[in-house]
Swiss-Prot record:
Keywords: Hydrolase, Membrane, Mitochondrion, Mitochondrion inner membrane, Nucleus, Phosphoprotein, Protease, Serine protease, Transit peptide, Transmembrane, Transmembrane helix. The active site is at residues 275, 333. It is found in: Mitochondrion inner membrane. Residues 51-95, 187-214, 264-268, 315-331 are mitochondrial matrix. Required for the control of apoptosis during postnatal growth. Essential for proteolytic processing of an antiapoptotic form of OPA1 which prevents the release of mitochondrial cytochrome c in response to intrinsic apoptotic signals. Required for the maturation of PINK1 into its 52kDa mature form after its cleavage by mitochondrial-processing peptidase (MPP). Promotes cleavage of serine/threonine-protein phosphatase PGAM5 in damaged mitochondria in response to loss of mitochondrial membrane potential. Belongs to the peptidase S54 family. The chain crosses the membrane at residues 96-116, 166-186, 215-235, 243-263, 269-289, 294-314, 332-352. This is Presenilin-associated rhomboid-like protein, mitochondrial. P-beta is proteolytically processed (beta-cleavage) in a PARL-dependent manner. It comes from Rattus norvegicus (Rat). One of its GO terms (molecular function) is serine-type endopeptidase activity. GO terms for cellular component: mitochondrial inner membrane; mitochondrion; nucleus.
Length: 377
């Protein structure tokens, strides 16, 4: 989820954030915060904002305690704590200008690319239909060479719905980024580009990249489970190409809403996770099918309508944003949910059904192309 994480300026005991089982984030001690930056940590012997005695001839500093009680030095590959502290701009409103234009530009490019992708998909389906007839004839006259494993993989893949096939790529991207977090030498890069924070020097690219970023395995698993569960419904409603455009745009838009809230309240801090985009998917499905029945994974006996679930989620995130709850990035959740509701209600008619001019231009480019000698057709 797009959740508050790690180090805040002027950190004290209980001012740092890290993953909490259940998909959320909780307050951790100073010692635990350093573990996120690549330092060794022992859960049984953790310190709670305490100082260890300074070693001889070494400047006093905070240190973690290993299982043997010795202090471990910070690796040279991991940035010192001071380099990960974020300093807000003295002009907070100006900070939002670049993210705003990036959000508008990226959203436009996402839907434009999706329209062209759909056009190319339709053309390729026609061609693949005739190629399939030829391939079936060739397969019937020559022996099969596929192994059992390949047959099982093909059988599993063909059993998936269009939505499940689509989100498989998204899940794979999230898993790859999760693995990168496990490499200590990449922590500096991951914090800079895969966590979104309006106080960071890099503002725009993390708005997209942080949508695929999870530090906690449980956090990623919970998000991907929800995405997988709603994938068939959302792709049936929007189609594969439109869904991808909505999902990517939702990640950027929800992060921009988070930026606005952080700047307005002065509560800066890095966020990461796919929750903003997933909230858009959930809100879109619940708005389109409000009478659908939903259940909690561990409490399948208790069911409720999709419409009521959406209202409860919006109410909780609104309260969390107003009251300053810090377990989740409630502003990003709320921004994603409102975007999903708006898109199903108005955005589909306003954006997707007006894509024809762009598709016609692309068709002309593909059909005519540049002519030699500058002649026209």
């Amino acid at each position: 989820m797009a959740l508050y994480s790690w180090v805040q300026r002027g950190w004290r005991c209980g001012q740092t954030w890290a993953p909490l089982l259940g998909g959320g984030y909780r307050e951790l001690s100073a010692t635990q915060a350093r573990q996120l930056l690549g330092r060794r940590f022992n859960l049984l012997l953790q310190q709670k904002c305490g100082f260890r005695k300074a070693p001889r001839k070494v400047e006093p500093r905070r240190s973690d305690t290993g299982s043997s009680g010795e202090a471990y030095k910070r690796s040279a590959l991991i940035p010192p704590l001071e380099e990960t502290v974020f300093y807000p701009s003295p002009y907070p409103v100006r900070t939002l200008l670049k993210p705003f234009f990036f959000t508008v530009g990226f959203t436009g490019c996402a839907f434009g690319s999706a329209a062209i992708w759909q056009y190319e998909s339709l053309k390729s389906r026609v061609q693949s239909y005739f190629d399939g007839i030829k391939a079936d004839w060739l397969d019937s006259i020559r022996p099969q060479k596929e192994g059992n494993l390949r047959k099982e993989i093909n059988k599993w893949w063909n059993s998936l719905s269009d939505g499940q096939r689509t989100v498989t790529g998204i899940i794979a991207a999230n898993a790859l980024v999760f693995c990168l977090w496990r490499v200590p030498s990449l922590h500096r890069t991951m914090i800079r580009y895969f966590t979104s924070n309006p106080a960071s020097k890099v503002l725009c690219s993390p708005m997209l990249l942080s949508t695929f970023s999870h530090f906690s395995l449980f956090h990623m698993a919970a998000n991907m489970y929800v995405l997988w569960s709603f994938s068939t419904s959302i792709v049936n409603i929007l189609g594969q190409e439109q869904f991808v455009a909505v999902y990517l745009s939702a990640g950027v838009i929800s992060n921009f809403v988070s930026y606005v809230c952080k700047v307005a309240t002065g509560r800066y801090g890095p966020s990461l996770g796919a929750s903003g985009a997933i909230m858009t998917v959930l809100a879109a499905v619940c708005t389109k099918i409000p009478e659908g029945r939903l259940a909690i994974i561990f409490l399948p006996v208790f069911t409720f309508t999709a419409g009521n679930a959406l209202k409860a989620i919006i109410a909780m995130d609104t309260a969390g944003m107003i009251l300053g709850w810090k377990f989740f990035d409630h502003a990003a959740h709320l921004g994603g949910a409102l975007f999903g509701i708006w898109y199903i209600t108005y955005g589909h008619e306003l954006i997707w059904k007006n894509r024809e001019p762009l598709v016609k231009i692309w068709h002309e480019i593909r059909t005519n192309g540049p002519k030699k000698g500058g002649g026209s057709k």
